[in-house]
Amino acid sequence: YKNFISDPVRLAAVRAALASLPAVDPDEASSELRHGLKGWLALFESNIIDSDAARQLMGELIKLESDLFAARRGLILQHINEAGQLEDATLSMLSTNLSTNPSEAARKSSFEALISLERWVLEHGLLDIVRQRNAFARAQGFDNYFDYKVEKNEQMSADQLFSILDDFEARTREANLRALRDLSQAHGAHATQPWNLRFLVSGDVTRQLDRYFSFAKGLQRWVQSFRHLGIEYRGATMQLDLLERKGKYQNGFCHGPIPSFFDAKGNWVAGQINFTADAKPDQVGSGARAINTLFHEGGHAAHFANVTQNSPCFSQEFAPTSMAYAETQSMFCDSLLDDADWLKRYARNAKGEAIPDELIRSRIESTQPFAAWGERGILVVPYFERALYRFSDAQLTAEQVLALARECEQRILGVAVGPRPLLAIPHLLNQESAASYHGYLLANMAVYQTRAYFEREYGYLTDNPAIGPALSEHYWARGNGISHNDTLLSLTGEPFNAKYLADSCNQTVEQAWEEARAKMAAAAERDYPQPTAPDLDATIRIVHGTELIADNRDSDHAMCQQFERWVGARYPAPVQ
């Protein structure tokens, strides 16, 4: 694939084909041809390295990254689990333990594992990779790799990006500091220690919520919720590999090896889409993480399955597809999981009882004060990465990079060390995701702008059957043939606006609770229509490595039952 998209001969052929077209398209077929060729031009220009020197540097960079990832596969991290036992742990397990384990010593063991990972990546090639990335960017006329990636991925300069990020930082700074002060006053100075912070913010509530987020029921709730939203997959084939196992890549992701498009004869080529996670069903919090993964990666899959252009270049997930644009689709879907009316309709315990209002309020009381802090947990990454890639080669020492990480965490998060230390974030290691993390924050800004539009237009989001068709028409159909900003203009009627996310972060607990109460009251009175489609219009396989757990050859309902039985047979109920 990389050889194909980086072939300069193909780029020259596309340019020649475009140059041969008449200045004015005489008919629709010519217009469609021009449209498709422009899509291929954007793809090749985003991925082809014109300079011989840069091509050589890229080859060396790929080797450095391959060596690091090969070594990383052999690294075993350990922590103390819920039962007080030392166990091997994935990044997901470390994160969940930090949030939910009532033992401070156990939480600290997870944090220390992450700190050890920071030192490990610095000792196993990350510094050389940063130097090589900068050399590669300079060979193409950029000051550094961060500037290069922002220009390539988001079609804006780093200065333009930081005009947005600086504005958001200023809008949410006081809310973040206020939350930390209040937490320290309530729990003492130790509350902001990195192994305590996440637990005190949400740990006890997460444990109480756990019984309402059955891991085994997660698949069924995803299918039902997406059906009620009117989301369909246009005949796509999807394979979901959701559970952790040794040697598996430790970060959820979605990949489409066969992009969707209409071929030259006008026949529909449905997408083939795989997504993965590393859930541990018997760990507290795993059910909530699982359904978040299903909504998030399922949102990506819905996006790529619904790109209806005349070439596959428009529906593949790499450049020129903007990360922020792609993440808007997935993060919009997983944002619904925080809505009180969604929780009331779907979050149920083993007896089928709905989550009580009091627990929803407790969740808001626990999380709303730290809404700004949560978003700033994303914000800190681009501040760190921009400064990192501005370092000279001589400055790139382990001690200086660690000092930079701690300085950024103090300035943006307000704590000496973040609960997820910066250099333990896997996105920084991979060429595709490095210097791109800001895309998540830009996406969440677009998510809240999108949510505000649907709330103005319809009054609600959960199980609103108008949402799937609207997203398909305005956000998904044209794929990367339209800019992120233009998708927002198409649906909401206004350009990119960070105000909606900042306003949500700055809400008080009482304001957020009143909004939640209003949603629940309206939902109780609403007559929800039945889904118009009988299923998600997809062939779905649930696997665990090479083992087939369940599929929907009979029906989505049968698949969900198979999955539930499989999980129940292999994992005891999590500790409550």
Predicted features along the sequence, with ranges:
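Post-HEXXH active-site segment of zinc metalloproteases
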Residues: S286-L294, A301-F332
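N-terminal helix-rich structural modules
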Residues: Y1-W120, Q395, Q431-A435, L536-Q576
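Alpha-helical recognition segments enriched in aromatics with Gly/Pro capping
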Residues: K265-Q272, N292-T293, E297-Q309, L343-A347
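C-terminal, non-catalytic "cap/extension" segments appended to globular domains
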Residues: L294, A302-H303, F318, F332, ...
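Short His/Asp/Glu-rich catalytic/ion-coordination signatures at enzyme active sites or charged loops
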Residues: Y1-D7, G36-L57, L86-L122, Q132-T172, ...
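Active-site-proximal, well-structured secondary-structure segments within enzyme catalytic domains
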Residues: L86-M93, L127-D278, I355-T367, D527-V575
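Post-HExxH zinc-binding segment in Zn-dependent metallohydrolases
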Residues: L165-E174, A319-E358
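Short pre-active-site segment immediately N-terminal to the catalytic Zn-binding motif
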Residues: R211-S214, F275-F295
